[in-house]
């Protein structure tokens, strides 16, 4: 005789790991060249002056300076730029 009842299976118990997306450096904050500004899927935020785009659409600073967000154009697209520190 079995000493334990059958365990049975469950259809739950798994979830994907969070991807830690979002804005990493906010408007007005200082950033060094190469620093990540936004991690995103697709181009929710577009690259402005002195901002590069990675192959996974990550936005990063090309120069040392301060981050500046703006809404541009008739489609009201959000854009991020890096302005040199004065």
Curated annotation (Swiss-Prot):
GO molecular function: structural constituent of ribosome
Keywords: Ribonucleoprotein, Ribosomal protein
Domain of life: Bacteria
Pfam families attached to this UniProt entry: Ribosomal_L27
Record flagged with keyword Phosphoprotein: no
UniProt keyword Ribonucleoprotein present: yes
Compositionally biased residues, Gly residues: 1-10
Cited Gene3D superfamilies: 2.40.50.100
GO cellular component entries: cytosolic large ribosomal subunit
SUPFAM superfamilies, per database record: Ribosomal L27 protein-like
Region (Disordered): 1-21
Gene Ontology biological process terms in this record: translation
Family as reported in the entry's similarity comment: Belongs to the bacterial ribosomal protein bL27 family.
Record's protein name: Large ribosomal subunit protein bL27
Organism: Cupriavidus taiwanensis (strain DSM 17343 / BCRC 17206 / CCUG 44338 / CIP 107171 / LMG 19424 / R1)
Gene: rpmA
């Amino acid at each position: 005789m079995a000493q334990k009842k059958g365990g049975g299976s469950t259809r739950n118990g798994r979830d994907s790991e969070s991807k830690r997306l979002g804005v990493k450096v906010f408007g007005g904050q200082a950033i060094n060249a190469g620093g990540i500004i936004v991690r995103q899927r697709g181009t929710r935020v577009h690259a402005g002056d002195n901002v590069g785009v990675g192959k996974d659409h990550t936005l990063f600073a090309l120069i040392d300076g301060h981050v500046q967000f703006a809404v541009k154009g008739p489609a009201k697209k959000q854009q991020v730029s890096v302005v040199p520190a004065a």
